[in-house]
């Protein structure tokens, strides 16, 4: 290893990897990591840079990229599971997009932005309990299957890991 005494080192690529050991899943898995990503999800409204990996339910890597995370949603920020936007930035030198057919109802093959949310609309009007967190995605799916041609959002369920810690079931 060589170090520059004048500290003129060029920034290098950062490699992140997620490993699942005795952690089977039945839905896709999103793993995000970064120095400040958990601070964002703990309620600090910052825009950290971090890595994004998405795996299928068998644990096989679909794609990975580096980009920016920021707050998404209103109601979800009143709860511990918070939604966020992920924006792939090719300026970081890794990928310009997540390249895969991520949604069953769409034929699009790459995405520069994904919304990852905890279905907080099911918590309205803050009544407590343990809602199923499927109302919003269910209605969106009915609209697509029924070909209603409404302004709708595709969704898939996933499990989220943040810096290696399990954060729960989310939608993207």
PLM feature spans:
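Phosphate-handling architecture centered on phosphoinositide signaling
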Residues: 1-172
